[in-house]
A protein has these predicted regions:
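Feature captures the catalytic cores and cofactor-binding loops of soluble hydro-lyases/lyases
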Residues: 1-171, 177, 185
Length: 185
């Protein structure tokens, strides 16, 4: 699925249903691997996150292709993805379950929030976790991580099928996140 729209009514209904209930409903329909493993909320008291997935895939960093100067490149896949993520979408990052370097930090999360993003999910770590927890954007990650993403992650593909926390995530899949974690519909 390349794009998905979700009605306000559906978004509101899903916002009232726990991820546990959604997982059981999906399991009854034969879908067993829909929970994103290891992606926990920075602030479990934030409202439930609901929106279509917009994805970014990281691969292991190669030092000669991933120097600090790439941050100056507006065409860099990470920067480009942040600017292309549609309002109301959930930005989902495949960090290969590696939290040793951040998937993003407060600058990018603030930009996504200002652009109307419904939330952020990674199976990796985040820089500036305490600052991000104060932002008005639901955010899910494995753990805080101070090193910049460039030390271990190289942004590669935008809005393609990814694996996040061992769950398949296709662009446009509906992501629901609450205090227990995130599920892919």
């Amino acid at each position: 699925m390349q794009s998905s729209t979700i009605s306000k009514a559906t978004r509101e209904k899903l916002g009232r249903v726990s991820t546990a209930t959604i997982c059981t409903a999906l399991f009854k329909r034969g879908l067993r691997n829909q929970m994103i493993q290891g992606a926990l909320p920075l602030d479990p008291d934030k409202p439930t996150m609901v929106g279509p997935a917009f994805t970014l895939r990281y691969i292991p960093a190669r030092e000669d292709l991933n120097p600090i100067t790439v941050f100056q490149d507006r065409g860099h896949p990470q920067r480009k993805a942040v600017e292309e993520c549609p309002p109301g979408s959930v930005f989902v990052v495949d960090s290969r379950k590696d939290p040793r370097a951040a998937s993003a930090g407060s600058i990018l999360l603030t930009r996504l929030m200002k652009r109307g993003c419904a939330g952020f999910v990674t199976d990796g770590g985040l820089r500036d976790a305490a600052e991000i927890a104060k932002l008005a954007i639901p955010t899910f990650h494995q753990r805080p991580s101070a090193p910049t993403n460039l030390t271990l992650h190289q942004a590669m593909d935008i809005n393609v099928p990814i694996g996040c926390g061992d769950a398949p995530v296709f662009p446009g899949d509906i992501i629901v996140g609450d205090s227990a974690g995130c599920v892919v519909i």
